[in-house]
Amino acid sequence: MDRSAARLTAALAPSATSPVATTQDHLTVDLTARSGALALASAHRQLRSALHARDAMDEWTIAAELRPPTVRAYEAAAAELLATASEALDAGWQSSCAACGQAVRVAAWRWEEALDADQERGQPTARRATCAACRALGRRGGDAATMLPNEVPSAGLLEPAVRARVDARFAGAVDGAAARWSTRQLRSLDALSSALERSSESAVMLGALRLTLSEAAAAMARPQRAGRTWWEVAPWQALLDAIDARRRIYLTAQPVPSQLTMSSDLSALTYPGGGAVVVRGGVTARTSLATLITRTPAIRVALLRVTVGGSADELSDRAIAARWSGEQSDADPLLVALQSNDAVTIASALARLLVAMNPLMRHDPLVVIDLDDHPEQLAGVLTAISLAGGTGSVLRRFDDDRTPGLTVTARLSEPPAIGLQPRSQISLMSDLVVAHGEPVTPRQLLPAYAAARARAAHASGELLDAAAFADELRDVADLHAKLRPAGSFDQLIALAEGRIFVEGRAERERLATPAADRADAAAFALVGALEAGEGVDEALVALDADPIGMSPELRSAMLDAYTSVVDGVRHPLRTVPAMEEERLAIAAGLLELGPRMGLHVSVAPALASTAVAGRTLGARTTVDPIDSSPPLRLRSDRAAYDAVDAVLYRRGRAVLFCEVVTGPLPIGELLLHRHALIASDREVVRLLVLAPALVPLLQLRLARDERLSAAWESGNWHLLAADRVAALSRLAAPRLTDLEGHLGAEPPARDAAQLDLGSMGWGVERGETPEGVNREPLS
């Protein structure tokens, strides 16, 4: 199950528990399906599904996901297609090697002007080709890419029969649709299309071949903007690339649930079973589904999904490319409108769609709307939900680890919240920053702000206006430019890199733990999911669910701190038991190192009974015979003090508070809460003993959060990489001054004045007594 399906499975959990006779009474509907994610999620919850594909290519994609062909059968069918059209595939793409003169098949020609490819004597500026003879001699085909002197690709007008077939395929399409391909490409594509029409393959295999040919045609189309360099890819090469991509998809595809059947007949929804009905989206499909739901009271719609956004130009290009596979229809205008980036257009189209699907709303399904991270789209979606009498919550998503998106969920019968009062923009943004707990850009706050604004409008009975709401969101995105800098003591202040934060006293007192701490815990949970071999996508969905979210750099750093990707598969760097074992071993090393440096040591009571190497940590502590209570404990919050992993101290001198972290890294909790409750003075030093893999994450968080960096400085914190504890232990006679050479992210390349232990009375040789300091004997 991919991440999109995992997210929908989680969304279905509340719906699947509503009181009905059986789960077979439940139906999920995707009105703009681009993949089979909802069908897979529904099968996991033992529900049926109806998927309305946006266009032909999406319909073929969904069919290939839910009923994938075997790789061997697909390869055989693709090879037969290539063989059938082999003569036409070679025409116009034959040349010879400039080095050895052997015949080669050109894979692509480069043109400085895309339209030059159709000139009878046009000369390309480069070519791509591979010479088998040269490659056998170790030249790697490099000479084959060298053009012949004054080389001109063979061109010529299309034969009348070919031209007639091409014109018939693009009848009714936009003007110039066939001109997206050169004459050479048209001749080969016509041969492939004709071969596909004559194919006797099964429906499943035929759909896979149609999808492959359409993808190849879209990949080699001429650029729409004039004046751009264009590589005219040979159809045989484009088709081989598309076949290879499809083969990899089928090889890596996860098994489809055995109970998931696929049909194109809506009447199948009235039969028991966990099947999926896949049809082409449009007015006819929506009307038929609404009629079926109206006439079949036993069917209850649990979830209604709509996808907004994308590229309307891309949708048009796909529809034109699909004509080579026999698809003549154009995309539904309502679905095209949903791919706009205009708030008014989206709100109008989505509102019409919800009205048309009113029979499906009888049992108050969960409405799930996926959209791009775009203010106009967000304004349009929330406006449409407002017009339908509801309000929505917004979550972030990363379905592919690269492209951010948003998901709006709503139940249209949900009553308005009680007691919500209209608030100013600054006041609402301040509360969002307070809840987030760390500096953030207004753009990151936009989804949470929009959802809060929509809830307030719903509570007051106000209907959102798409255009005005979009303008308001644009103002919020530009809020940084309107704020004053730090030192103004305003509710909100402007920081570097376009971020904002709170500076008012009331807001500072209410600041929550940084949201990055919660995200770090979610990233760490991924390790456990990977160990168990399940729930990986669910863990990633939880990591990205915060509507405010985090920067891509921080997200990447968190994932890299605990996991790595090898051959496209994510693996944990270390298991959770191994991390805990390492943490306890480091704590034991500190407790043994302290007495060798002439220090007393104590350990957190929660760790005292834990055994390491056959000896408990509590047995490694040394107590001052005169004062058994560690320094500053009586002046501190007892619970916070006792939570410190290890304390190394010398009575009358100073204290080393040591926190050992191997994962997760709750740096906000440590700096802003636990150690804020522990008394301090000028001789207190705090050491964060950190696993090396977490060091980049710590550095990034300190650099991006002024509150954390200020607490780091004021608390006299210093970084000690965990592997340096063993290095110190290997010294014959370790001293506190030796500690300085091991501090920092990359010791010994550090700021020389990072920690001056000598000025605090720490760097005294044994047997020496500094002036004015009473030396207490150690037991």
What are these regions (language model features)?
Residues V576-M579, V601-R653, P664-P666:
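Active-site metal-binding core of divalent-cation-utilizing nuclease and nuclease-like domains
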Residues I418-H458, R508-P547:
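Positively charged, polyanion-binding regions of nucleic-acid-associated proteins
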Residues D637-Y641, V655-H675, L697-L698:
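Active-site-adjacent loop/helix micro-motif of nuclease/hydrolase catalytic cores
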Residues A693-S779:
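Domain-level recognition of nuclease-like catalytic cores that cleave nucleotide substrates
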